[in-house]
């Protein structure tokens, strides 16, 4: 009997040429993305998938509109997350953060060019909005040695020619994060360098419909991973072996299993190591009848950041009264502040009208009471009143913005910290809390 097979091996044999998000149903594709595990969990949760092509067009239009509105010739991006936003392509993202070998130029007419690692120009070819792939933006000393200035001149000349053709007569160029020789070379070409980060942060602040669908999916995947981490912690803590790193490793593993990418921080601490906050997770063996607090800072499926925080009580005894009070105070803080969120409210109003933490928690409170979120922690930042800078954030909230609402309840000299954080979408008439993960009932005083 003859058996016939399609030349392309499918990721999901039950589907046609594309998966539910419009990406190729090809086992050997270049494009990264969610795994079948994630898709199955999202199907069970009845989540709508994003249309990735539509999401990419929305982002491209947002950036282009912001460039045109400022009268700029173009936007030159070196930051790997700005490049991800513009092109939806990745290449050694963490290595790229300290070895900036990639660049993307978005011209005022929408023409977009990618400079990539010389051996991997194919990594953005799946996106038709990227019109050209080139190499030569690696303007750092490790790669260029004492001739980095020569490489910078060649690169800057390419930028000049592209903008001559696609933004004739315009000489103001927005640049986000550029190496010193790159900056000098661009200025030598006659460009007036403008703040590209101001452009990208504001463009990224409002999410389109498919970005919101992607965030819902990413948030679900993150919360499933957090549940796996909690189950592990509750079953293992007290065995005399399990340490903070063992617990944190579960979140990493479960994130990657669902197509997630990395975690920005190491913010999990147990017992007295949770105070002061910002101690990174380490080899401390976790004990029963202690608090474990963490902040996900997780870049997950579709490159979307899910930034939520929780504190758990793990043990057979009841938590102390001061722990329960701190937890309840933190929940009140984020819930009260969340109620202020709606389109049109000015960011300074949020600062001025914040729920006030008890005096004993003021010194060690979190660095902000809210911040934007998308591909990572993003603009805007909502400061506490004593840290607010007049004129820094005089902008209204808009529908489609997503914010993380924070609480750190931590007394100086104490032996624990409560860390809480929910991720919220600004809707047309208010807000929607995207975070479904429950608060620990023992710390809430209901167990």
From Swiss-Prot:
MF terms in GO: dimethylpropiothetin dethiomethylase activity; hydrolase activity; metal ion binding
SUPFAM superfamilies assigned to the protein according to its UniProt record, in alphabetical order: Creatinase/aminopeptidase
Region (Disordered): 1-26
Binding site for a divalent metal cation 2: 307, 371, 406, 421
Matching InterPro entries: Creatin/AminoP/Spt16_N, Creatinase/aminopeptidase-like, DddP, Pept_M24, Peptidase_M24B
Cofactors (names): a divalent metal cation
Ligand binding (a divalent metal cation 1): 295, 297, 307, 421
Catalytic activity: S,S-dimethyl-beta-propiothetin = acrylate + dimethyl sulfide + H(+)
Keywords, alphabetical: Hydrolase, Iron, Lyase, Metal-binding
Quaternary structure (record): Homodimer.
Family that this chain belongs to: Belongs to the peptidase M24B family.
Protein name as it appears in the record: Dimethylsulfoniopropionate lyase DddP
Origin species: Roseobacter denitrificans (strain ATCC 33942 / OCh 114)
């Amino acid at each position: 009997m003859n058996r016939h097979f399609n030349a392309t091996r499918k990721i999901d044999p039950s589907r046609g040429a594309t998966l539910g998000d419009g990406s190729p149903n090809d086992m050997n594709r270049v494009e990264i993305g969610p795994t079948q595990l994630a898709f199955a969990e999202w199907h069970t949760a009845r989540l709508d998938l994003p249309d990735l092509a539509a999401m990419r067009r929305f982002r491209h239009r947002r950036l282009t509109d912001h460039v045109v509105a400022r009268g700029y010739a173009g936007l030159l991006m070196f930051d790997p997350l700005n490049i991800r936003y513009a092109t939806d392509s990745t290449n050694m993202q963490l290595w790229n953060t300290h070895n900036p070998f990639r660049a993307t130029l978005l011209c005022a007419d929408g023409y977009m060019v990618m400079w990539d690692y010389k051996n991997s120009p194919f990594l953005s070819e799946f996106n038709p909005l990227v019109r050209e792939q080139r190499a030569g933006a690696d303007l750092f000393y490790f790669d260029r040695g004492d001739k980095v200035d020569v490489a910078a001149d060649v690169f800057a000349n390419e930028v000049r020619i592209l903008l001559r053709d696609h933004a004739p007569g315009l000489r103001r160029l927005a640049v986000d994060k550029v190496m010193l020789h790159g900056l000098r070379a661009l200025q030598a070409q006659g460009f007036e360098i403008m703040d590209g980060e101001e452009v990208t942060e504001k463009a990224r602040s409002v999410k389109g419909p498919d970005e919101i669908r992607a965030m819902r999916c990413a948030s679900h995947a993150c919360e499933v991973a957090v549940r796996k981490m909690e189950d592990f912690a509750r079953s293992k803590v007290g065995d005399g072996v399990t340490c903070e790193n063992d617990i944190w490793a579960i979140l990493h593993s479960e994130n990657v299993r669902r197509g997630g990418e990395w975690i920005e921080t190491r913010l999990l601490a147990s017992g007295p190591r949770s105070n002061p906050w910002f101690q990174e997770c380490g080899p401390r063996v976790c004990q029963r009848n202690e608090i474990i607090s963490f902040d996900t800072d997780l870049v997950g499926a579709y490159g979307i950041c899910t930034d939520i925080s929780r504190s758990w009580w793990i043990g057979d005894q009841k938590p102390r009264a001061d722990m329960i009070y701190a937890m309840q105070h933190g929940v009140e803080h984020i819930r009260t502040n969340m109620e202020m969120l709606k389109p049109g409210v000015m960011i300074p109003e949020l600062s001025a009208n914040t729920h006030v933490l008890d005096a004993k928690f003021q010194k060690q409170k979190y660095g902000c009471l809210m911040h934007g979120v998308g591909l990572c922690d993003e603009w805007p930042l909502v400061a506490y009143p004593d840290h607010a800078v007049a004129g820094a954030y005089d902008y209204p909230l808009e529908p489609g913005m997503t914010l993380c609402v924070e609480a750190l309840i931590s007394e100086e000299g104490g032996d624990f910290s409560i860390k809480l954080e929910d991720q919220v979408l600004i809707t047309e008439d208010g807000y929607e809390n995207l975070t479904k993960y429950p608060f620990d009932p023992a710390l809430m005083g209901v167990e």
